[in-house]
Amino acid sequence: MQKKFHNSYLAHFLLFNFFFLAYSLFSTLISVYMQDLGYSNAQVSMVVSASFFASMLAQPIFGVLSDALGIKKVFLFSFLAMMVGAVFFMKATQLWQLLVWYSLVLMLVNGVNPVMDVLAAQSPYTYGKIRIWGTIGYALGSQLAGLIYQRVAPQAIFPVFIGMMLISSIGLLGIQPKHDRA
């Protein structure tokens, strides 16, 4: 079974669909979530802006790390750190905590995001057949975030994010990027 999963379409589907679904879950309703915690629009804007700034700084670093250490190693560490960051974000109540943990998670997500396209291009399948699952996952994540927020609880989004990242990690384990360091 493991040999059939190695570089399979299923492995790529799991990686792309659930990574982007998780990304959407985590980020889609951040402003609503923070406003429900009592933060002003300016405070929400500060948290979101800080995350984009951290992401901008991280992207070139992720490229260098992926080249030096290997995509899979960098991704596995990043996925684990995203899940840990989500736990801390879920428990955060102070503005500085929300800023730090949201920025960390989004920095990691946006750091690996461009390298995801490398994985899609290197897969044994056409780029579009792999990348479409990221688009579908993101769209599903936006809708799912709203449903979870409204029907379960706002903080329930974060354990679901962690679950989706675990599924994405299973997909990552089934992929062997070309020219990756072992």
What are these regions (language model features)?
Residues 2-52:
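Helix-loop boundary and gating motifs at the non-cytosolic
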Residues 17, 85, 95-112:
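Hydrophobic core of transmembrane alpha-helices in multi-pass small-molecule transporters
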Residues 38, 70, 91-96:
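Helix-breaking motifs and short loop linkers at transmembrane-helix boundaries and internal kinks
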Residues 52-60, 138-139, 143:
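Residue-level signature of mid-helix packing/kink "hotspots" within the transmembrane helices
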Residues 73-88:
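Structural signature of the two symmetry-related core transmembrane helices
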Residues 109-124:
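Intracellular juxtamembrane helix-capping segments at the cytosolic ends
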Residues 156-174:
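Symmetry-related core transmembrane helices of the 12-TM Major Facilitator Superfamily/SLC fold
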